[in-house]
């Protein structure tokens, strides 16, 4: 029922925020709140955030520089150059696009990690304004045509600022057959961007973190997952 579903979502939100360090679970910090919204006492964080997807092989072979050099990574409305293992993107318009075609993907959920940072602030306030970076795959399941539904399931986005940061993009792909897919990355704004890595994994974006009184696992997939915590903790 709705009440049971709402409780599951609340627990999901508390667990996710706690793992990301955005929500404290030390009881005294929230003693002023009503009991029905106080978090469970996980205690203080004891370990680093674990990304379960990264325990599987990376399906995209090569650094961004290698992908560009081999002609696998292509861009529209931008100029690209190589710097070490990374690439520098200089947009020509307010929206530029990168694409990697013929990525061989198995069936099942896919998590993509993109590590990037902006490098040339056009004005004094730009370091306070992050950039939007979008990612999408071809041949995703059909969802409702409403904009918000597509943003939630297929046209995912993250934020990139002036410190190197890794965004994750998680795609649920029930009943999608294995085959060659296209990864599309869209960058908003005209500020130069440096992409350090692009990695693709055939696992849900499950996060795990150890606390004083608990080990918290957050599973955003639509299916149950079997995780051997001894492999991570």
Spans of features found by a protein language model:
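Active-site-proximal substrate-binding groove within the catalytic cores of carbohydrate-active enzymes
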Residues: 1-142, 151, 155-157, 161-162, ...
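Short, surface-exposed loop motifs enriched in S/T, G, D/E and P with embedded aromatic residues
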Residues: 145
């Amino acid at each position: 029922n709705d009440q049971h579903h709402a409780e599951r979502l609340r627990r999901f939100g508390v667990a996710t925020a706690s793992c990301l360090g955005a929500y404290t679970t030390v009881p005294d910090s929230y003693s002023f709140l009503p009991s029905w919204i106080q978090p469970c006492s996980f205690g203080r964080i004891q370990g680093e955030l674990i990304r379960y997807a990264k325990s599987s092989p990376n399906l995209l072979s090569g650094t961004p520089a290698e992908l560009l050099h081999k002609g696998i990574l292509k861009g529209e409305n931008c100029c690209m150059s190589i710097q070490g293992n990374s690439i520098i993107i200089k947009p020509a318009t307010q929206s530029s696009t990168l694409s990697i075609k013929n990525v061989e993907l198995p069936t099942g959920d896919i998590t993509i990690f993109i590590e990037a940072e902006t490098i040339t602030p056009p004005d004094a306030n730009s370091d306070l304004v992050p950039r939007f970076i979008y990612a999408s795959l071809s041949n995703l399941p059909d969802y409702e045509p409403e904009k918000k539904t597509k943003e939630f399931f297929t046209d995912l986005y993250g934020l990139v600022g002036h410190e190197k940061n890794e965004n994750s993009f998680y795609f649920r792909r029930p009943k999608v057959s294995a085959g060659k897919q296209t990864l599309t990355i869209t960058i908003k704004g005209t500020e130069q961007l440096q992409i350090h890595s692009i990695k693709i994994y055939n696992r849900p974006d499950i996060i795990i973190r150890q606390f004083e009184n608990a080990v918290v696992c957050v599973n955003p997939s639509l299916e149950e997952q079997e995780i051997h915590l001894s492999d991570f903790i």
